Amino acid sequence: MFSIKPGPRNLPIDNPTLLSWNITDGDLNSKLNTLEYLNCITNIINSCGVYPQGLKDREIISTFHAEKVINDLLKNDYKISLSPDTTYRELNKAAQRSITAPDRIGERKTWVYQRDTMIERGDNSGVYQYGRAEHFTHIISDKPSPKDKYVAYAINIPDYELAADVYNINVTSPSGQQETFKILINLEHLRQTLERKSLTAVQKSQCEIITPKKPGEAILHAFNATYQQIRENMSEFARCHYGYIQIPPVTTFRADGPETPEEEKGYWFHAYQPEDLCTIHNPMGDLQDFIALVKDAKKFGIDIIPDYTFNFMGIGGSGKNDLDYPSADIRAKISKDIEGGIPGYWQGQVLIPFIKDPVTKERKQIHPEDIHLTAKDFEASKDNISKDEWENLHALKEKRLNGMPKTTPKSDQVIMLQNQYVREMRKYGVRGLRYDAAKHSKHEQIERSITPPLKNYNERLHNTNLFNPKYHKKAVMNYMEYLVTCQLDEQQMSSLLYERDDLSAIDFSLLMKTIKAFSFGGDLQTLASKPGSTISSIPSERRILININHDFPNNGNLFNDFLFNHQQDEQLAMAYIAALPFSRPLVYWDGQVLKSTTEIKNYDGSTRVGGEAWLNKGCSTYQQLYNEFHALYIDKAGIWSAFEGVSATKNVLAFSRGDSVNINHSPHDGLVIINKGNEEVEGTWPNKLQPGIYKNMGSNSVNIIINNTRKIIPPGKVFTLRGGTLNINIPGRSALLLGKTGEPPNYLYL
């Protein structure tokens, strides 16, 4: 067990009325004041994490004590400032938990098991040595495990600790001395607790919260990546201006079944063949890994968007002959693990601990080895959708897809599980979803499964008083993948968007239009924003824009028409969609955990698309700059295109961006020029730019003539403009995204 160490006594102790804390640990019996107690907590977290092995240590750093500490400091006129500790990474999986991970011993507590080495040694020394278990607060000595070599512990950690995380707490004494510690807290529960305390308005004002700003609004599709892979790169994703990360389905699935053909084992598509929504265990990670991912992302202001696979269940390899889920071999493995080796593990992977019984309406506990779906929860048809039925609504929404059985909205069990799944995700801090294969869902199923919709959530401003009632309203990023291949699809998707104003959608129609415009002989002017016309039927603020989707390269030649003809075209298309107002680009990254196609070749063996562009985590230099431009201009409505001259040809698309763009001849503060041709283009942009500090957020260096002087501006270069018209040289196969980042100093010009 970790030993409590009071630490140095040179802490900013000004007020003798600070609380005293009695700490007993073995031979150590110390009486510490609040600040010394904070030092002890900091030592434990730095040495062992927030779930150390010792029972006393875990109790000491609980959120309950943290709230008492902060209340005591504020009552004694100390100032405190709280900020997320972005350097802290909880590596012990016991740090994460289901709210009420169930076992057979009762509700509202989690029971975990630790191996009793005294029993293993066969002696009666009374010396217990336990390995790391789940998480716990105290021993229940009269509750033995039903397994011979384990001892049971009760976990009675409050639900609100689920969202607790490590924060830096900077303490300033009344005399001005400062010291920084670490503490485990849940901000919202802290505010509620302190509201009930007898603090004055002045004392409340001394508690400041510093929350991370959202790095951007672009979405990274972390396809085929483990939760740990994503965690390890979180700071880089923030640097590249991602505000959202879409992750693989968070369910129980496996990369092969007992009778899965060898040629199908280990492939990516198994992630879209769920075995269970109630538990989380798959090649990408388990429930603890997922919770750690959500917490780490929030430290950087990033939201996690899971892929929701509600339409179909897995086929369990070619040998699955029933509709019991999870499959029999999975249930058998879980039971064997529980009885024979790691009984606490599977209970800790339960995402949905309880649901209401569809018949009795009584609260029903979920056990990981039980059957959760049966034949009555699926559509009756056992036929697959045939090639000539893709415009048949009945077939699309009731038949199987490649053998996968279709869930039915007529089943109360299905709807309750899906609805509770959404609720549990929200409890973990998930602020959005991607609804997979929406064209196969009846509107009723979408309506019932993700209801009630969460349209907005309250987010604290970057630097605010803990008790400030004003919050920043943030929209939740809910969107659906509705693959549009015909007019019927377009109509059905539009109907869904009309019914659900909380949903956005991937704009497949604009993708096809963009592919055609960037192809050889295609006309970029078809993508220009012109008065009285729109480039898409989906409202701009509800569009998710893509240049590649995981389905396109991974289904043989089925989606070849959805692929660009050249890597450079795919990259230039990303510059275009990142520059549009209100919409969000979805950037593709293949983490290569399961087998997948990472490159499409031409007939001559050269790369058509993919390769490094799909494997670089969405963090190439050009993508970082595109995302930065997008974050700068997403909320600025103005867009104006040039309709004549060298800036308006089949190969060149140019448009201004900024708030004042609707007045065509007023100075603008953003400029986009895309040249898909091989030849460089030089010309004068007809609209003046505002004076200011500008940055080249495009893919290539450009030549700009200012005051009769030609300057080479490389990507990422910041420079100052007096304003006025620009003469610009744009290289072939390149994109210029010029954005104003600040006001110019009067004394410095390029």
Curated annotation (Swiss-Prot):
GO terms for biological process: carbohydrate metabolic process. It comes from the Bacteria. Gene3D superfamilies: Glycosidases (3.20.20.80), Golgi alpha-mannosidase II (2.60.40.1180). Disulfide bonds: none annotated. GO terms for molecular function: alpha-amylase activity; cation binding. It holds the Pfam family Alpha-amylase_C. PANTHER family: ALPHA-AMYLASE. This is Putative uncharacterized protein YgaQ. It comes from Escherichia coli (strain K12).
